[in-house]
């Protein structure tokens, strides 16, 4: 059974247990929302991306051709578009990270305006940018899965079982846009302002 189908069944069981009070809840709609929001907290993202980084470091230690690429960004939208493009061209985000440069954060993300020194930005600048980036990356997941759900509905409506199975496999095999973010030391903590 697919992940999506299992999620629907779990919600349907829960709705039945709650009786009439939950009878208007559509289990498939709930399952879709859960899949579109797989990361509930920053800690979920941290655990997920730490696992990726550990795996990538081990792979690199065993084979130096398995290096990672870090793509610089200074705004959530930029990071989102980079990951959407990478997934479109490579079908996954394997060994692709986002990168925050100290000078870029100071020049483009400082709450006090552009600052001359790469380490002169507020200590909240980087954490705010990371939160923004992960919000945009999670939105990219929701958008992509929403498209898959529309395809699934159309395939079901047309009665095309082959297309339904193909789209179902896309949903179950969905690869998130959420990737590790690397920051150089100057992008780390900023000043104590």
Residue ranges and their predicted role:
Residues 2-76, 84-91, 147-176:
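N-terminal amphipathic alpha-helix/helix-capping segment at the start of soluble metabolic enzymes
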Residues 74-77, 82-83, 93-129, 136, ...:
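Glycine-rich, proline-tolerant flexible connector loops at the mouths of alpha/beta enzymes
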Residues 130-133, 169:
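Extended, non-catalytic scaffold segments that flank or surround catalytic motifs
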Residues 179, 189-193:
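Active-site beta->alpha N-cap acidic-glycine motif
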Residues 181-183:
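Residue-level marker for buried hydrophobic side chains located in beta-strands
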């Amino acid at each position: 059974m697919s992940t999506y189908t299992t999620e629907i069944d779990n919600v349907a069981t829960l709705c039945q247990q709650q009786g009439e009070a939950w009878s208007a809840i559509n289990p498939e709609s709930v399952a879709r929302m859960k899949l579109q929001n797989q990361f509930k907290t920053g800690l979920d993202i941290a655990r997920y991306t730490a696992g990726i980084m550990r795996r990538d470091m081990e792979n690199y230690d065993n084979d130096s051709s398995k290096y990672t690429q870090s793509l610089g960004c200074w705004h959530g939208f930029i990071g989102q578009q980079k990951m959407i493009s990478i997934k479109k061209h490579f079908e996954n985000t394997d060994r692709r990270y986002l990168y925050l440069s100290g000078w870029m954060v100071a020049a483009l993300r400082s709450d006090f305006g552009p600052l001359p020194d790469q380490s002169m930005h507020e200590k909240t600048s980087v954490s705010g940018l990371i939160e923004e980036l992960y919000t945009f990356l999670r939105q990219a997941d929701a958008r992509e899965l929403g498209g898959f759900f529309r395809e699934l509905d159309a395939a079901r409506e047309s009665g095309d079982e082959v297309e339904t199975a193909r789209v179902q496999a896309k949903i179950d095999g969905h690869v998130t846009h959420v990737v590790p973010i690397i920051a150089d030391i100057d992008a780390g903590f900023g000043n104590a302002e």
